[in-house]
């Protein structure tokens, strides 16, 4: 029998038919919806006189446009000041009500970012195909699922048929062996991977993360690395199923129960790549070589270790790369050879679908405890990824740690990850952000984004500039997974 990768197995489990043009029709187990990419899809159903093929395969929640201050949230839909944002959230409510789709509405205790809500509800399960009109759907691959983003027209197709036409990708394995040093996290792993292979390195591939350092990560840590697979060019990111996967899923609202649970676990336990499976490309990193990472430019691949210096375009022989460095330096307001630790900051954002889970908040709080946000920092935001994460953090007293340190404690949502809600950067402002993209204008017109782990973001907040979180000593305990 031919050895198979995890991706091969998941593909074969869901392939309905192969078409003459080489594409396949695959079955979709779970469809997650939010307010931005679903309105046109629902309208398409109405115009065609169709209903969703499997209503219970869909769940929805608003996240991109929702305000995150308590006052605005208490005001309901009318508190959303931007007319387009308000209309999108309202339209999602109406569409889900009309078609009978389960939605965690803006002020539901279970509301949150789609890629946080799906896993914590158990709506994401091992072996599933999971799609959403959002590129960071790769997050769900942490559960041994085949998960990726889709476009608005495809959202309509999945609603109508529960299937999708797509082509099989190649297999890419990223192996990270060894033990992560103190203060180095899952976010640092994935930033280091992107720095190594570039933002096009995974193009056309399904990316499986493997190795002892990956197996040592918590499920939250695995979600972080799978989340940013798309920044490495891979539409799909995944980690094989193990006992941590199964333990995380057990008992969650959507998880199987009783005999169904036993049968599911038996199947899930097979969702690993066979020892002799062929990968088209293999990339290897040693965990011990990875240091806390900071992005300096306008692409996630423009990333360096905390003890390094911004590149000098004069030393770059390739004219295209040299021009790219020059443009990034100009936009970011940095100088060639500037030390990363000399980059001063205006704002700090801890949140997003990459790093807003309970372990992320614990890691940031461990650094913030007993310290104060630097006087030069205009704003330091902590935005939980869901209402359930927020409630757990408050039960653990993390909100008090952040508030005492001078951070703002917010309601769940995408927040400052992207400029689609009131949380934005001003032009020229530098932000230490735990999000996933640092493109020009991503967090606001003219805003300058630096991607870091939650611990590094908290360390920057209390210092006013980037510092090596490892130099803060024992306060960084427990920061390895985030």
From Swiss-Prot:
Its cofactor is [4Fe-4S] cluster. GO terms for molecular function: 3-isopropylmalate dehydratase activity; 4 iron, 4 sulfur cluster binding; metal ion binding. Pathway: Amino-acid biosynthesis; L-leucine biosynthesis; L-leucine from 3-methyl-2-oxobutanoate: step 2/4. GO terms for biological process: L-leucine biosynthetic process. NCBIfam families: leuC, PRK05478.1, PRK12466.1. Catalyzes the isomerization between 2-isopropylmalate and 3-isopropylmalate, via the formation of 2-isopropylmaleate. HAMAP family: LeuC_type1. This is 3-isopropylmalate dehydratase large subunit. It comes from Xanthomonas oryzae pv. oryzae (strain KACC10331 / KXO85).
């Amino acid at each position: 029998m031919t050895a198979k990768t995890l991706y091969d197995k998941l593909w074969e489990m869901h392939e309905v038919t192969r078409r003459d043009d080489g594409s396949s029709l695959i079955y979709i187990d779970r469809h997650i919806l939010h307010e931005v990419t679903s309105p046109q899809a629902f309208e398409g159903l109405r115009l065609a006189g169709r209903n969703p093929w499997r209503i219970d395969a869909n769940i929805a929640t608003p996240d991109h446009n929702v305000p995150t201050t308590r006052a605005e949230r208490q005001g309901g839909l009318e508190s959303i000041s931007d007319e387009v944002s308000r209309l999108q959230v309202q339209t999602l409510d109406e569409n889900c009500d009309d078609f009978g789709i389960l939605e965690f509405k803006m002020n539901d205790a279970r509301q949150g970012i789609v890629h946080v809500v799906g896993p914590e509800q158990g709506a994401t399960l091992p072996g599933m195909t999971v799609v959403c009109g959002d590129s960071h759907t790769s997050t769900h691959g942490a559960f041994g699922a085949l998960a990726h983003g889709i476009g608005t027209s495809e959202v309509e197709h999945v609603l109508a048929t529960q299937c999708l036409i797509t082509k099989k990708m190649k297999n890419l394995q990223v192996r990270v062996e060894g033990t992560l040093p103190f203060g180095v996290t899952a976010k640092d792993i994935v930033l280091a991977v992107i720095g190594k292979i570039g933002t096009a390195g995974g193009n056309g591939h399904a990316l499986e993360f493997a190795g002892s350092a990956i197996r040592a990560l918590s499920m939250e840590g695995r979600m972080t690395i799978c989340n940013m697979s798309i920044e490495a060019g891979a539409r799909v990111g995944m980690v094989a199923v193990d006992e941590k996967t199964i333990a995380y899923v057990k008992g969650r609202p959507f998880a199987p129960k009783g005999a169904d649970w036993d049968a599911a676990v038996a199947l899930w336990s097979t969702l690993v790549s066979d020892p002799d499976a062929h990968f088209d490309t293999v990339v290897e990193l040693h965990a011990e070589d990875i240091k806390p990472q900071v992005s300096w430019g306008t692409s996630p691949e423009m990333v360096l270790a905390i003890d390094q210096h911004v590149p000098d375009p004069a030393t770059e022989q390739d004219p295209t790369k040299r021009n790219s460095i020059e443009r990034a330096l100009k936009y970011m307001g940095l100088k060639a050879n500037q030390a990363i630790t000399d980059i001063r900051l205006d704002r700090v954002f801890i949140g997003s679908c990459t790093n807003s889970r309970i372990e992320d908040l614990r890691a940031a709080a461990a650094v913030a405890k007993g310290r104060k946000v630097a006087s030069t920092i205009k704003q330091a935001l902590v935005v939980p990824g869901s209402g359930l994460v927020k409630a757990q953090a408050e039960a653990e007293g993390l909100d008090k740690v952040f508030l005492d340190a001078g951070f703002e404690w917010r309601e769940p949502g995408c927040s400052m990850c992207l400029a689609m809600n009131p949380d934005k950067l001003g032009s020229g402002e530098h932000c230490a952000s735990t999000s996933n993209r640092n493109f020009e204008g991503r967090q606001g017109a003219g805003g300058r984004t630096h991607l870091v782990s939650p611990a590094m973001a908290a360390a920057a907040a209390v210092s006013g500039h980037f510092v090596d979180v490892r130099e803060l000593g024992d306060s960084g305990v427990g920061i390895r997974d985030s």
